[in-house]
Amino acid sequence: LSPEGLRSRLFPLVYFQKQAPESVLEHWNIWVGRQPCEGFELRAGEIEVRADDVQMWAEETEDHQVSLVLYCEKLTPILKEDTDKVWWALSMLVDQTIGEVSAIAFVAGFDVYAQPKDEPAKLLSELPELLQSMGLSLWRDGSDYLENSYLAYELKPVEDPEADWRLDVYTGSCRLPVLINDYLTARSDMVDEYHKDGIAAGFLLYPLSGFTGEERVKAILDFRDNLRDAILRDAGEEAVTFLGGATGLYCGYLDFIAWD
């Protein structure tokens, strides 16, 4: 099951994977994300290319990912006529080299060059070793990755108590940051895509005025954990997936995906 390179699509696919009945799993192995395949050769129309045919220049980003520049002599003639096909081919090769989930986790993006850079290059087939040298372990399955993909963030809160929800947030963690970014910028692309499949994404909020004393921070986090556990106990894991939470000046927030 391919998320087509999008973290947001991993969640529905992992949910589908976990809901598969035992009668299906007796005959099928369900993997989320294209698996790495050493020696993979892509053949599509006039394209016949391997990872060994692609030169690679990698730069580590501040958030411990890599930004790639790729050059492939075999694809250069096609680049002028059909840029999208070349990007698709190279994206496919990256996925097959390190696995699609690892590509989502570790590749910040890549550029395609029509000429090689004047710097020593590695081959794309060496990307797994490069990532491992950075202390990164490749992910085989989308479920394992999502369970360990929390991103911590800090924001400058709006002090006006009448401001919109979440604008008071100063710290939080989330497994799907695009959901928060879309909300704060009044975009609905991802939520609209989820709604088409009967999926609802949102957050619960609760006032923090009742939390006082030296243990206030711990009490707020404990309450959020207890709220999450109570919902999971009563609704069941098949009904909801929690994405993280946030603490604001006036409210606490619990982010979730609800499944129909």
Name the predicted role of every residue range.
Residues 2-28:
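An N-terminal, globular interaction/scaffold subdomain
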Residues 3-5, 32-34, 72-74, 208, ...:
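Short, flexible loop/turn elements at secondary-structure junctions
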Residues 10-13, 82-93, 216-234:
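Well-ordered, non-membrane alpha-helical segments in soluble/globular domains
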Residues 20-38, 260:
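Conserved short beta-strand edge segments in small beta-sheet-based binding/regulatory domains
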Residues 25-26, 159-260:
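C-terminal structured domains
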Residues 26-34, 98-120, 233-253:
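Short glycine-rich, low-complexity/disordered patches
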Residues 37-58:
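Short, low-order "capping/linker" segments at domain edges
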Residues 50-52, 59-157, 181-186:
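Long, hydrophobic alpha/beta structural blocks
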